[in-house]
């Protein structure tokens, strides 16, 4: 997959303090995540600069399945063609009262596809577009 100027390969993973929906609903862990803005979308510094983006900017990320808004973290610690969303955020159930509405979920952008040989979910084969919103 080759990404063009505003297209990225969406990747996701866990963070040291967050692992699943349940941990995002724990007040002490969510307080840490909010304090350090851990829900942000990671984008490579060179790619961000080419799109006129700065650390903390609000962007719109979209795939054929979803469009969401999220603030970005500009970093050298990611491949230029990738955008990273930490997992565990973006809880859609209002019953998860603590974590509800915080961050976005990579699952919202990911179609239900299975790799035919291994039977694993194809969750890292998603292309997304990213553009700045607001000022």
Where are these regions (language model features)?
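Long, low-complexity segments enriched in small/aliphatic residues
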Residues: 1-31
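Long, contiguous, secondary-structure-rich segments that constitute the structural scaffold
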Residues: 21, 26-42, 46-135
